[in-house]
Amino acid sequence: MKNETIQYRTAPTPIVAKAPEQRQAQGGQMVLTGYAAVFNEPTSLGRFNEVITPEAFEAANMEDVRFLIDHTGVPLGRTSAGTMELTTDARGLRYRVTLPETARARELYEAVRRGDISQSSFAFRIGREDWEQVEGRLTRFVRSISVVLDASAVTFPAYEQTTVEALPFG
């Protein structure tokens, strides 16, 4: 039986920003990059721990993923629009998003640059999971994700090991 429940995960990501005037003078864009998910890092979700396994994203649909703030609001990037890219490597699910020239995007960029927002998350639907007792604690191993719905810069992440940073302009 397929679980259609949307799962949200958040993680830390540092961002660096310049004022809009400096960006325009340098011809730069506001770009954030980071890890929305990390592999093989257990996190506590209350009554159980969770681990995202390296194979979890192999068959995931990532064709129309939105970049959000705290999993809500107007998208600030989107894979289907070509403004966000998602890749996986040995560490986890990495994103790179080019932010629009909007007040909300500038506020996010500055908050990340200052370190006020330093983590990320992702929303997904599970394709396959296994449950085990690990060191006396019930642990869910996410083996397959059917679809990734969003990657978000967040205030309160589930995974402390996630990252985000602002790339320099120019």
Residue ranges and their predicted role:
Residues P42-L45, G77-R78, Y159-T163:
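Short helix/loop capping segments that flank catalytic or ligand/cofactor-binding pockets
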Residues N40, V74, E101-T102:
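Short, surface-exposed beta-strand-loop junctions and turns on beta-sheet-rich folds
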Residues M1-N61:
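Polar/acidic, low-complexity leader/linker segments enriched in S/T/G and N/D
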Residues T53-V97:
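A glycine-rich, hydrophobic loop/mini-helix early in the fold
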Residues Q7-I15, R23, V31-T33, R66, ...:
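Residue microenvironments linked to proteolytic maturation
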Residues V38, G77, R140-V142:
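A sequence-level detector of short linear motifs
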Residues F39, T72, F156:
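Residues that form or immediately flank small-molecule/cofactor binding pockets and catalytic motifs
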